[in-house]
Amino acid sequence: MTSRSPFSTIPLSMNQDSYQTRTTVGIRKKTFSERACQFMEQAETFMAPFTPYMPLLGRFLIVATYFEDAIRIVTQWPEQVSYMRDYRRFRFGTAPLLLFVCVVLMLVGSTLVVFKKRQAYAIGSLLFVTLLQAFAYGLITSGEMFFRNMSVIGGLCLVASDTFIHRRINRFAGLPAVSEHNKRTYFQLAGRVLLIFMFLGLLAKEGSGISWTRILVHILSVTACAMVVIGFKAKFFAAVLVLILSVANFIINSFWSVPRESPYRDFYRYDFFQTLSIVGGLLYLVNTGPGKFSVDEKKKIY
């Protein structure tokens, strides 16, 4: 008579199934986080050869709207002068003078930004032109233009943040030293907050034609904007916004499909290049990161 082990009656298969079930449940809870991290690692590996060129591309796209605006004014000089003189009431030769100043500041400032020369003066001149044109063309009260200009200014803030080096300046004895790194941090925070104004403008503009696809895109956009503002997985969600905005820009603002004689062609072209500037700001954010005031940086500390 053979003896039976007291453990032989334990249903091993049930224990294995139960263990596998518990293990599977544990894995499912981490699936999204693990997949997101894996996707980001793969994306960084894929983009590694292009990373050195990202800052240059970002700066060029940020100022693309200024290049386009300057070229448009030059190629349409008689029409622009006539509009400013007859409709905006710029008399006594001030109309061509105003346009000339805008063209020079936009071309010189944009070129300096692209090549990282005299950044403070270049960004200051572009900010001045942005405000000057808003008043001159009577767009200061336009809600849509306000959101767009804020987004473009956000991109310029990110470029400005890159000009501050890590050093401390003590101008007055007995007072705390001023950290250039802190200035850079504040500009990075302001830049990424202002960048999302573009999406707020789009959401406010699209009040009709509700569909499930549009609702899903809006939810994804709002979520990504919130993550960029607080700085949680900011690079990943900024890349998501780049994808959404790029696709929407080529679909909505396809000025090349509008006849040349149509008056709407210039409006579509202006919107297209201004949206490209915001895409450039987001690309710059993808490259530089959210900065010190962000959840991502706090996680590194704690």
From Swiss-Prot:
Task: Please give the coiled-coil regions recorded for this protein.
Answer: none
Give the transmembrane ranges.
Answer: 95-115, 120-140, 193-213, 215-235, 236-256, 271-291
Motif annotated as Di-lysine motif, chain positions: 299-302
Q: Which domain of life is it from?
A: Eukaryota
Q: Give this protein's Gene Ontology molecular function annotations.
A: COPII receptor activity
Cellular-component GO terms for this entry: COPII-coated ER to Golgi transport vesicle; endoplasmic reticulum; endoplasmic reticulum membrane; endoplasmic reticulum-Golgi intermediate compartment; Golgi apparatus
Q: What is its main location?
A: endoplasmic reticulum
Q: Does the keyword Transmembrane helix apply?
A: yes
**Topology in the lipid bilayer:** Multi-pass membrane protein
Q: Which GO terms describe its biological process?
A: endoplasmic reticulum to Golgi vesicle-mediated transport; Golgi organization
- PROSITE patterns registered for this protein in UniProt: SURF4
Similarity field: Belongs to the SURF4 family.
Domain free text: The di-lysine motif confers endoplasmic reticulum localization for type I membrane proteins.
Full protein name: Surfeit locus protein 4 homolog
